[in-house]
Amino acid sequence: MATDNDSFPWDQDSILSSDMFSATSTELCYENLNRSCVRSPYSPGPRLILYAVFGFGAALAVCGNLLVMTSILHFRQLHSPANFLVVSLACADFLVGLTVMPFSTVRSVEGCWYFGESYCKLHTCFDVSFCYCSIFHLCFISVDRYIAVSDPLTYPTRFTAFVSGKCITFSWLLSTIYGFSLLYTGANEAGLEDLVSALTCVGGCQLAVNQSWVFINFLLFLIPTLVMITVYSKIFLIAKQQAQNIEKMSKQTARASDSYKDRVAKRERKAAKTLGIAVAAFLLSWLPYFIDSIIDAFLGFITPTYVYEILVWIAYYNSAMNPLIYAFFYPWFRKAIKLIVSGKVLRENSSTTNLFPE
């Protein structure tokens, strides 16, 4: 992400000849074109490794989130307002794996953008939009979990399908409008005309964002993050108190089984814990990138290119992490995967399969 800083010595030739990570030689992205960007290709070994690592991340994001969406949408037992939020979150991560990561793989490994100027801007819009869409979804999911844990008996009447739909609509609309309007209006480049001119070359896809918009980007990340941290802190305090109450009651009464309220509370606490881990994974993935964007915006591109690329791909890999988290913590998801992969979902009445242990 490019930013404006008067004290930083921007030189057009040095920008066009800057290399990506450590490379073996210097070439042009388009040998027969004037104003072609310079590329510094990797040797075959590192290239193969990078393609494998980045390609695996993209494939995992696509296939893993597709399994999440298929599981929840197919099996009626999983149809709930909370799970509809999870499906929508998986859709955003799926689109990152489908429309962003494959093209970023080529750009990161080859050091050039070969997909045209139009898709460069569209690719960046997808990147920005789906990132913020995930943030907003996770924020709403944390609020949903708070309601479920704090008052599990009245939760179904408070967080309905209609409320879930409004949260989903808000997340997609706001993130899409922000991402596309920011880049297609050129507001991000205001005051950076000289820098944009210096960065422009055939085979490049650099995003120039001025300090004001970098700060706005960070706020759009920070505010939902603070909400999530606050809400999950309250959730775990409530969960701890509930666990102590249940233990105290168990000692006072010899019950053969837990009450309905206790079972519901236990289930909601487990769901909150799992989704809390998903939120923590998201923050650990994206926070370094956003901090780095602030540093670069106000200190003038002090981050080495290879460090920036690493931070970007750590953030991208978050789109592949949620399905792994669900698979590790949710027995119903593992069972759903087996039914989908084995083709048993094609059988009649498979949508009514019981995925929860008795």
Curated annotation (Swiss-Prot):
One of its GO terms (molecular function) is trace-amine receptor activity. Disulfide bonds join 37-201, 120-205. The keyword Hydrolase does not apply. Residues 69-83, 144-166, 234-274, 334-358 are cytoplasmic. The chain crosses the membrane at residues 48-68, 84-104, 122-143, 167-187, 213-233, 275-295, 310-333. Specifically expressed in neurons of the olfactory epithelium. One of its GO terms (cellular component) is plasma membrane. InterPro entries: GPCR_Rhodpsn, GPCR_Rhodpsn_7TM, TAAR, TAAR_fam. Keywords: Cell membrane, Disulfide bond, G-protein coupled receptor, Glycoprotein, Membrane, Receptor, Transducer, Transmembrane, Transmembrane helix. It is found in: Cell membrane. Its main location: membrane. It is a multi-pass membrane protein. The keyword Mitochondrion does not apply. Glycans are attached at residues 5, 34, 210. Residues 1-47, 105-121, 188-212, 296-309 are extracellular. PROSITE patterns: G_PROTEIN_RECEP_F1_1, G_PROTEIN_RECEP_F1_2. Disruption phenotype: Mice lacking Taar2, Taar3, Taar4, Taar5, Taar6, Taar7a, Taar7b, Taar7d, Taar7e, Taar7f, Taar8a, Taar8b, Taar8c and Taar9 show no visible phenotype or behavioral deficits. They however show an absence of aversion to low concentrations of amines such as 2-phenylethylamine, isopentylamine, N-methylpiperidine and cadaverine. Belongs to the G-protein coupled receptor 1 family. Olfactory receptor specific for N,N-dimethylalkylamines trace amines, such as N,N-dimethylcyclohexylamine. Trace amine compounds are enriched in animal body fluids and act on trace amine-associated receptors (TAARs) to elicit both intraspecific and interspecific innate behaviors. Ligand-binding causes a conformation change that triggers signaling via G(s)-class of G alpha proteins (GNAL or GNAS). In addition to the well known disulfide bond common to G-protein coupled receptor 1 family, trace amine-associated receptors (TAARs) contain an unique disulfide bond (Cys-37-Cys-201) connecting the N-terminus to the extracellular Loop 2 (ECL2), which is required for agonist-induced receptor activation. PANTHER family: HISTAMINE RECEPTOR-RELATED G-PROTEIN COUPLED RECEPTOR (PTHR24249), TRACE AMINE-ASSOCIATED RECEPTOR 7A-RELATED (PTHR24249:SF78). This is Trace amine-associated receptor 7b. The gene is Taar7b.
